[in-house]
Amino acid sequence: MSMYKAYKFRIYPNREQKIMIDKTFGCTRFIFNNFLSERKTKYEESKIKLSAYDELKELTDLKKENKWLKEVDSCALQKCVFHLDDAFKNFFRGNGYPRFKAKGEHESYTTNNTLNEYKSVKYESIRIDFKNKVITLPRLKKVKFRGYRTTKEIVGKIKSATISKDANKYFVSVLVEVPFIKPIINPTSVIGLDLGIKDFIVTSNGEKLKNEVRVNEKRLKGLQKGLARCKPGSKNRYKMKLKIQRLYLKIKNARKHMIFKLANKILKESDIVAVETLDVKSMYQVHSIAKHLNKVPIGDFLSVLKYKADWLGKKVININKYFPSSQCCNRCDYKNEEVKDLSVRKWICPKCGFEHDRDINASVNIMFEGLKIYMKESII
């Protein structure tokens, strides 16, 4: 059995390499937008659905018409076609319709690791030299990198590399297929998690873990006002935009660090984690909490928790979103309809008289419900 693991490094390309990376961003953006427009037009006019393989055939003709497309990595252009195809597949599963890519927004491209041969010598197109701290990438050759993983070796087969640019900094994310044997653990501890806005995580142990990341809204608002006053196309506008991007990158990295720290802490202490399935889309429609949801990375946390649990052989159990975790007394199971009101933070059970903290009570109920589901699955 094998699993995929990503390693991200910051890279330091020279002037020529930066030009090639930016040129590849432009070419992949052109291919993506061109085929997105073609798919949209053909479907609207004659209900014809194009596949990725139809577009790959057209890509060859497109490269003949536009010679500059041949200057960049061909694998990156092909991968871009498959990314568009995946975007349409996700759309038919219920996600949003694919959007046209704009210059300067989430710039990245992906290239595959291929086996090449030169003078009877076989070599891979993507290679990492930890000793000299360089990574070899198609069309870029050797690029310097730096990061906390520079002292480690990557075990497994490199499948692809994604080069990205954020706040004028360049990064590479290397996807590796690693051999994996899932650990078999006899669970001895269980925990329930109630996710929220004021307290990010409330555990069934009574612990409240707050969102440690604070967004400097005053500074962000000031920078955005400054950007609005700048003349379009001016150097000052570019500098102001870069300051905003760097602030967002700082916030993103802080949130990522917090998510991994909390996920590791929870999985270190528990073998079974029960968590409520939240309907985040519906929550965004509630005006009073929509703004606060942007500051709480609930979806990212659940994704990290799930994949880390898989790696450690632990279990994450999702509880039905309609389960009344806040309304039921965890002592006598009495259901109090009045607790539906979110302003009720503490309440006394009319049946047994026990005083409840809304979030702690919810996390305890989630834990018990998760334990029931686990026991049923174990019997089956």
Show which residues each predicted segment covers.
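Nucleic-acid substrate recognition interfaces
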Residues: 1-380
